[in-house]
């Protein structure tokens, strides 16, 4: 790895194997292998908030920037990015209010776009003659689409993974979607659980589905939590539930934006996904 440190905060080159400590009891060989690939970890400042990122690979290669889903974190890609790093310069980061990044008073989509642009610039993704490709999962797709819609010249394209794309009429018919991010009012406090086991019991997949890969479930659960106040609680900022995207019912506009954004686009979705149907 060719080390890069454009930002003021020091960065460290490490492997992610320590991410398995206390997270996965008996990790498979492939998971250990993927996390043994060296990566850079650091922080950059975006509008007064520290943004946590990981970087893999050689910065002389074309770039990929990876955007995680709502209430998730960059470690969603920790076991995927190392394989891409053989051919690409890969960066994944935590949105503010999630993972190990700092919190904000509010989370408008405009600040999400600013974070994306700043991370791409400060980690060197923009230095290559080929502009980076956005790989965006779920909520990250809204951020990626907004960024590429406003700054198409700064990206080579976008790959959208399991972003909810439904007709407005179908959206309205599904009452369970009223609990989507931004649809709730008020700022609640995250509960503090007495121990990790109690906290982990509250970790679920969304949408609800069977756990097919228990080690990845355990990995994601552990890194979604933190020790605090003598117990364990979620890393995410509860203020996220008032994000601008939900308050203006932005999900209703997603299908049109996917069509109208002028850029190279690809969509990947789960065969049995409830967020992307045959009608989509």
Stretches found by the model and what they are:
Residues 226-280:
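Conserved serine/cysteine hydrolase catalytic core
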Residues 87, 129-173:
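Conserved hydrolase catalytic core segment
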Residues 1-64, 86-88, 125-129:
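Alpha/beta-hydrolase fold catalytic core
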Residues 46-49, 54, 92-135:
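Active-site loop/oxyanion-hole signature of alpha/beta-hydrolase fold enzymes
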Residues 49-100:
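Conserved HGGG/HGGXW glycine-rich cap/lid loop of the alpha/beta-hydrolase fold
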Residues 188-248:
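Conserved alpha/beta-hydrolase catalytic His-Asp/Glu region
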Residues 161-194:
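A catalytic-pocket lid/entrance helix-loop region that shapes and gates access to the active site
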Residues 65-69, 137, 269:
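The conserved beta1-alpha1 loop
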């Amino acid at each position: 790895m060719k080390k890069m440190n454009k930002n003021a905060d020091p960065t460290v080159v490490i492997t992610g194997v320590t991410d398995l400590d206390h997270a996965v009891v008996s990790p498979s060989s492939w998971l250990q292998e993927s996390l043994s690939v060296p990566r850079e970890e650091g922080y950059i400042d975006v509008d007064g908030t520290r943004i946590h990122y990981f970087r893999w690979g050689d910065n002389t290669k074309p770039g990929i920037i990876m955007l995680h889903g709502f209430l998730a974190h960059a470690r969603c890609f920790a076991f995927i990015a190392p394989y891409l790093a053989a051919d690409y310069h890969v960066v994944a980061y935590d949105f503010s209010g999630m993972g190990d990044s700092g919190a904000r008073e509010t989370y408008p989509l405009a600040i999400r776009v600013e974070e994306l642009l700043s991370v791409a610039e400060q980690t060197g993704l923009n230095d290559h003659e080929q502009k980076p490709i956005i790989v965006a999962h779920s909520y990250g797709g809204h951020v990626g689409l907004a960024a590429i819609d406003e700054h198409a010249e700064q990206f080579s394209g976008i790959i959208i993974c399991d972003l909810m794309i439904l007709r407005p009429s179908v959206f309205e018919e599904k009452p369970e979607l009223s609990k989507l991010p931004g649809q709730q009012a008020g700022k609640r406090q995250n509960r503090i659980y007495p121990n990790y086991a109690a906290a982990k019991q509250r970790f679920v997949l969304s949408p609800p589905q069977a756990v097919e890969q228990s080690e990845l479930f355990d990995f994601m659960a552990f890194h979604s939590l933190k020790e605090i106040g003598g117990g364990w609680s979620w890393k995410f900022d509860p203020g996220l539930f008032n994000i601008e995207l939900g308050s203006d019912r932005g999900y209703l506009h997603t299908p049109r934006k996917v069509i109208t954004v002028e850029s190279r686009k690809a969509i990947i979705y789960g065969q049995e996904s409830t967020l992307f149907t045959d009608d989509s």
